[in-house]
């Protein structure tokens, strides 16, 4: 069986930056304890488990404001997905030390939205309902930012404003965004369009669209809550025409998916640790459908290998 290692795949710079920021916080003895992350720093349980080993507490919940109410003291890290101005204000009110690990691409979209709101625009924001990135973006001004996920959501919009801008969550499928933007343009011909798919997401999606075409099956290594990982599986099926399965790690691979495959493509979400993906590739490369001894799927990557290395600060 041939394993097609789709390139590029895995960690993007926004994810690495966020993890390095969080690790440096853990190593800084001057910062007040406890140290919390407001939601998952990135959508990967292996990463949050590794941070737990370092004494960083990940708090999750329905929304960032709700999670914040659980914290009375210490240091709070804002995740790569960004937060609303209201969350930042509330953290200041509570006297918490805050560290912002928002991805620069998300910050860029927030700044664009703020600029357009100041010019009197209403914003249509294409994103995944219940995901923290749209929550942070829409939270800039919930009365003038309209979250849409589907064509039906667009049809339900009733905006009466000469100034309308449409933009999007950075990790959406670029094909879905293009389709929804076209629908918005049809409904509001005067709309100003700003496609904000981040370059890392775009390159990874295009790589799957092209490189998974020849495979019998695609394995996407990524957390179930990772939007960009789920979109890679979608791109494999809808654009490359190759059946795809998303797995959190090697233990979730079903032998039935691969036993008859001649070629298996492998990619990974932007928040998937490289050693976790390597373990999947190593398993597939040694897999023999006729030898049950090669079927054992066991995750052996220690948590210490999950996070990027940083230098400890000298006291």
From Swiss-Prot:
Catalyzed reaction equations: isopentenyl diphosphate + 2 oxidized [2Fe-2S]-[ferredoxin] + H2O = (2E)-4-hydroxy-3-methylbut-2-enyl diphosphate + 2 reduced [2Fe-2S]-[ferredoxin] + 2 H(+); dimethylallyl diphosphate + 2 oxidized [2Fe-2S]-[ferredoxin] + H2O = (2E)-4-hydroxy-3-methylbut-2-enyl diphosphate + 2 reduced [2Fe-2S]-[ferredoxin] + 2 H(+)
Cofactor note text: Binds 1 [4Fe-4S] cluster per subunit.
Record has Metal-binding as a keyword: yes
Pathway(s) this gene product operates in, as recorded in its UniProt entry: Isoprenoid biosynthesis; dimethylallyl diphosphate biosynthesis; dimethylallyl diphosphate from (2E)-4-hydroxy-3-methylbutenyl diphosphate: step 1/1; Isoprenoid biosynthesis; isopentenyl diphosphate biosynthesis via DXP pathway; isopentenyl diphosphate from 1-deoxy-D-xylulose 5-phosphate: step 6/6
Cofactor(s), by name: [4Fe-4S] cluster
Broadest EC class assigned to this enzyme: oxidoreductase
Matching Pfam families: LYTB
Presence of keyword Transferase: no
Keywords for the protein's UniProt record, in alphabetical order: 4Fe-4S, Iron, Iron-sulfur, Isoprene biosynthesis, Metal-binding, Oxidoreductase
InterPro entries, per database record: LytB/IspH
Gene Ontology MF, one: 4 iron, 4 sulfur cluster binding
Residue numbers annotated as active site: 133
Residues the entry annotates as binding [4Fe-4S] cluster: 12, 103, 198
Residues binding dimethylallyl diphosphate: 43, 81, 131, 226, 228, 271
Amino-acid positions noted as binding (2E)-4-hydroxy-3-methylbut-2-enyl diphosphate in the UniProt annotation, renumbered to this chain: 43, 81, 131, 170, 226, 228, 271
Domain of life, source organism: Bacteria
Example of a GO biological process term: terpenoid biosynthetic process
Binding, isopentenyl diphosphate: 43, 81, 131, 226, 228, 271
EC number in record: 1.17.7.4
Primary role: Catalyzes the conversion of 1-hydroxy-2-methyl-2-(E)-butenyl 4-diphosphate (HMBPP) into a mixture of isopentenyl diphosphate (IPP) and dimethylallyl diphosphate (DMAPP). Acts in the terminal step of the DOXP/MEP pathway for isoprenoid precursor biosynthesis.
Family: Belongs to the IspH family.
HAMAP family per UniProt: IspH
The protein's name: 4-hydroxy-3-methylbut-2-enyl diphosphate reductase
Gene that encodes it: ispH
């Amino acid at each position: 069986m041939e394993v097609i290692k789709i390139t590029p795949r895995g960690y993007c710079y926004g994810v690495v930056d966020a993890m390095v920021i969080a690790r440096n916080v853990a190593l800084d003895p001057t910062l007040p304890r406890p140290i919390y992350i407001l939601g998952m720093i990135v959508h990967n349980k292996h990463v949050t488990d590794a941070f737990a080993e370092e004494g960083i507490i990940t708090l999750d919940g329905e929304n960032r404001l709700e999670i914040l109410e659980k914290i009375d003291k210490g240091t709070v890290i804002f995740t790569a997905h960004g937060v609303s101005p209201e969350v930042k204000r509330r953290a200041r009110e509570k006297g918490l030390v805050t560290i912002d690990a928002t991805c620069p691409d998300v910050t860029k979209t927030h700044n664009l939205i703020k600029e357009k709101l100041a010019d009197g625009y209403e914003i249509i924001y294409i994103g995944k309902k219940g995901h923290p990135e749209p929550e942070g973006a829409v939270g800039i001004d919930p009365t003038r930012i309209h979250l849409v996920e589907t064509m039906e959501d667009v049809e339900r919009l009733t905006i009466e404003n000469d100034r309308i801008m449409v933009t999007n969550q950075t990790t959406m499928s670029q094909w879905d965004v293009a389709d929804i933007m076209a629908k918005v343009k049809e409904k509001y011909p005067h709309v100003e369009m700003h496609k904000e798919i981040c370059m890392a997401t775009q390159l990874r999606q295009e790589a799957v669209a092209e490189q998974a075409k020849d495979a019998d099956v695609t394995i996407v290594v990524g957390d179930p809550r990772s939007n960009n990982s789920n979109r890679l599986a979608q791109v494999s099926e809808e654009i490359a025409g190759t059946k795809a399965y998303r797995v959190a790690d090697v233990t979730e691979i079903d032998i039935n998916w691969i036993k008859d495959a001649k070629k298996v493509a492998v990619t990974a979400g932007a928040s998937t640790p490289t050693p976790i993906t390597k373990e999947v590739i190593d398993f597939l490369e040694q897999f023999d459908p006729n030898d049950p001894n090669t079927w054992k799927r066991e995750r052996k990557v220690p948590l210490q290998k999950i996070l990027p290395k940083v230098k400890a600060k000298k006291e």
